């Protein structure tokens, strides 16, 4: 602590080309020795004595957004001017809170306005705007500019499929159903295969198929375009049944068939033998190493 130099107030600090970088107001320049601070049990950097006088928060002028206050919230300012002086003096203590709130609202509206204007600028550059758009009679052009963005968002939502039930099924103008499918209130869903009983193929007459008797009436009624067809008796005496294709063997049957086939003819499943010609000749003797002590320097790794 003894090696520290006395603190120099910023007002008396040397100001000139030889002086160091000027410190902000309230910061004191001191020559600090870290070796002394390590031996000293006291805190390394004690807080300055004039802690309360240091301006920590930035100073914001009160009426910075005065012109914005007039343009954005004209009605609110007019109503506040119309207040009697007695109430104004009573509410003087609440003035800072009201100012902060108004500033917050103004900043929000400013940000919104800038965002909308940048969106419109981009739309104009990209050619996304309708050229023949005219604003509504009761609205000013400024308001319709911002309404246009919400309108475009709504169109985007409709395109992405977020339609309501009323939009999906529009109510029919006609109260009674007509023959045309477009104007009828209930639209039939069209598929590949007809599902109604009226559109299904008519069942064959059992008497035309079987003139002998009416025992097969139930089986003939069950006959349809899809599903298993029962046996139909014909005059020629042959039984007519739907061909469903050859029965597919189960994998166990396939494995059994392969095993029996391999047992019957084992030569089929043997891999072909490769005939490698052996070159007959004298085998070369293994080479002996003729190493001399000086050659060991080359073979030794560098770490040794």
UniProtKB/Swiss-Prot annotation:
Residues 77-90 have a biased composition (Polar residues). Residues 1-22, 38-57, 69-96, 159-231, 262-304 are annotated as: Disordered. The modification Phosphothreonine is found at residue 45. It holds the Pfam family P33MONOX. One of its GO terms (cellular component) is cytoplasm. Residues 171-186 have a biased composition (Low complexity). Keywords: Cytoplasm, NADP, Oxidoreductase, Phosphoprotein. InterPro entries: P33MONOX. GO terms for molecular function: oxidoreductase activity. A motif (Flavin-containing monooxygenase motif) lies at residues 68-78. Its EC number is 1.-.-.-. Its main location: cytoplasm. It is found in: Cytoplasm. The modification Phosphoserine is found at residues 183-184. Potential NADPH-dependent oxidoreductase. May be involved in the regulation of neuronal survival, differentiation and axonal outgrowth. Belongs to the P33MONOX family. Interacts with NELFB, NOL12 and PRNP. This is Putative monooxygenase p33MONOX. It comes from Rattus norvegicus. The gene is P33monox.
